Amino acid sequence: MKMIVGLGNIGTRYDETRHNTGFMVVDQLARDYHLGAFTHLKQEAVAVSGVINGEKVMLVKPTTFMNDSGRAVGPLVDYYDIDLDDLVIVNDDLDMPVGKVRLKTHGASGGHNGLKSIISVLGTKNFNRVKVGIDHPQHGTVVSHVLGKFSKEERPKFDQAVEQAEHALEDWINGEDFAKLMNAYN
């Protein structure tokens, strides 16, 4: 089974905010493949499972706050015996412009607290990621930026990035090597 974890903050107050980019990508996959509703798991997450192009896939959204994402991801990886090659984390990235998508097979957190938490709990930096750009704030604080919504001008670029992230994930689900996909999508 492949597991795709979208990072975000749970609660309607955070819906459609930049920091919930990961949630928005997995929500789009769930809608497009008619996987049904996300249900609560005991591992501090909501998830939906199904078959996408012949492959069993679980889409996950931690119900912890972003900074504690590892509390959900670690137990899920253990419980479902997920090989790290079969795990992808989808997260927002301040260091990339809105509309940009980048795939990585390993690396540091880049200052992303959700990734820091996952790295700490898993004990490794070696797991696949799909990073979606949300850009640095032009004005105001980083916190207000990541917890804010995309502007009318940004939204079409963001929607295109979600679609591109979804295509990359579909290619990976279909058996494409993640490292090779980096060349195609980065």
UniProtKB/Swiss-Prot annotation:
<feature type="active site" description="Proton acceptor">
    <location>
        <position position="19"/>
    </location>
</feature>
<dbReference type="InterPro" id="IPR001328">
    <property type="entry name" value="Pept_tRNA_hydro"/>
</dbReference>
<comment type="function">
    <text>Hydrolyzes ribosome-free peptidyl-tRNAs (with 1 or more amino acids incorporated), which drop off the ribosome during protein synthesis, or as a result of ribosome stalling.</text>
</comment>
<dbReference type="GO" id="GO:0005737">
    <property type="term" value="C:cytoplasm"/>
</dbReference>
<keyword id="KW-0378">Hydrolase</keyword>
<protein>
    <recommendedName>
        <fullName>Peptidyl-tRNA hydrolase</fullName>
        <ecNumber>3.1.1.29</ecNumber>
    </recommendedName>
</protein>
<comment type="similarity">
    <text>Belongs to the PTH family.</text>
</comment>
<feature type="site" description="Discriminates between blocked and unblocked aminoacyl-tRNA">
    <location>
        <position position="9"/>
    </location>
</feature>
<keyword id="KW-0963">Cytoplasm</keyword>
<feature type="binding site">
    <location>
        <position position="67"/>
    </location>
    <ligand>
        <name>tRNA</name>
    </ligand>
</feature>
<feature type="site" description="Stabilizes the basic form of H active site to accept a proton">
    <location>
        <position position="92"/>
    </location>
</feature>
<dbReference type="GO" id="GO:0072344">
    <property type="term" value="P:rescue of stalled ribosome"/>
</dbReference>
<dbReference type="GO" id="GO:0004045">
    <property type="term" value="F:peptidyl-tRNA hydrolase activity"/>
</dbReference>
<feature type="binding site">
    <location>
        <position position="65"/>
    </location>
    <ligand>
        <name>tRNA</name>
    </ligand>
</feature>
<comment type="subunit">
    <text>Monomer.</text>
</comment>
<keyword id="KW-0694">RNA-binding</keyword>
<keyword id="KW-0820">tRNA-binding</keyword>
<feature type="binding site">
    <location>
        <position position="14"/>
    </location>
    <ligand>
        <name>tRNA</name>
    </ligand>
</feature>
<dbReference type="Pfam" id="PF01195">
    <property type="entry name" value="Pept_tRNA_hydro"/>
</dbReference>
<dbReference type="InterPro" id="IPR036416">
    <property type="entry name" value="Pept_tRNA_hydro_sf"/>
</dbReference>
<dbReference type="InterPro" id="IPR018171">
    <property type="entry name" value="Pept_tRNA_hydro_CS"/>
</dbReference>
<feature type="binding site">
    <location>
        <position position="113"/>
    </location>
    <ligand>
        <name>tRNA</name>
    </ligand>
</feature>
<dbReference type="GO" id="GO:0000049">
    <property type="term" value="F:tRNA binding"/>
</dbReference>
<dbReference type="GO" id="GO:0006515">
    <property type="term" value="P:protein quality control for misfolded or incompletely synthesized proteins"/>
</dbReference>
<comment type="function">
    <text>Catalyzes the release of premature peptidyl moieties from peptidyl-tRNA molecules trapped in stalled 50S ribosomal subunits, and thus maintains levels of free tRNAs and 50S ribosomes.</text>
</comment>
